[in-house]
Amino acid sequence: MENERKKEHLENFLKSNFKSNTLFDNVYIEHFALTDLNFDEIDTSVNFLGKKLSFPLLINAMTGGAETSYDVNEDLARLCKNFNIAFESGSQKVALQDDELVETFTIVKDILDEKNIIISNLSALSSLEDAKKAVEMLNSDAISLHLNPAQEIVQFEGDRNFKGILENIENIVKNLDVPVIIKETGCGISKKTCEKLLNVGVKYIDISGYGGTNFIEIENLRRTDLDFTNIYGWGIPTAKCIIDCRKISKDFTLIGSGGIKTGEDIAKAIILGSDMIAIAGEVLRYLIHGGYKFAEDYLKSLIYQTKMIMLLLGVKNIEELKQVEYKIFGKLKEICEY
């Protein structure tokens, strides 16, 4: 049943068409005509989880368990290796329940080596024992525990009881041997949520804001008994999440994600306060609709666009990009000033 649900998720993701807004279009950054840089010398490398990446990007696989997942995960892992960027697995819950599905996840270990970054993935409601098993399965550098109450409550067979989730996160953070990333799944991390996570020792937060893959829509497309289309707009826009969470503290790694599709999106997300960027749906669309080369060309374009914007801002590396001044306006300014 879990395997079939994963297959439906992938199919419905490709069917989904609700248009949401990250509010990056409400962020103004200013062109610098006297740029004094050589494009080929612009450095996009970053250190993440103790390893050096060529670009501050994490690809979230989103898949695993379904028959098509093996090929998708294999191609995503190849992309991550070739571009020297990080790979995050889709939820490994299905593989912990069914040994026959483990191979759809472990294929990435045949491609990625100790120089690459692999991140496991489970629900934040998972036990410490399952978290350990998920890390062992992929020999991961870290584990991402996802928060997805909106998805679960719309999902017919989803969780309804979220009691004790913060205490569970704290237990895993304190007792797991690898770093723990806490991530949302498209509805965003608020200031209040971020503060609570930092207070229990979380050092890595993926804000996964509203503006990208909409799991409320994906789950609603599976339902025939109830309709949740009026809730498709639920969530905190990605730009607001980044601004609010970074204001709280600079002493944690902030991963910006949720509807990031272009080099300009990446540049703005970093300027607002992100240390890393995560992309899931956009890469998956290119891969499924056009194949490996299509996805490869998309990532090449994404990196080129980001470097181009860095050149036009007069910054030569990611640390300088973080210092670029910006202005916010429109709806983003309204909802950030409360």
Task: Give residue ranges: language-model regions.
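An N-cap/entry alpha-helix motif that binds or orients negatively charged groups
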Residues: 1-49, 53, 331-338
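C-terminal extensions of enzymes
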Residues: 1-3, 7-15, 283-338
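Glycine-rich phosphate/ribose-binding loops and adjacent secondary-structure elements
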Residues: 163-289
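A gly/proline- and charged-residue-enriched helix-loop-helix capping module
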Residues: 84-122
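Active-site cofactor/substrate anionic-group-binding motifs, chiefly glycine-
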Residues: 48-98
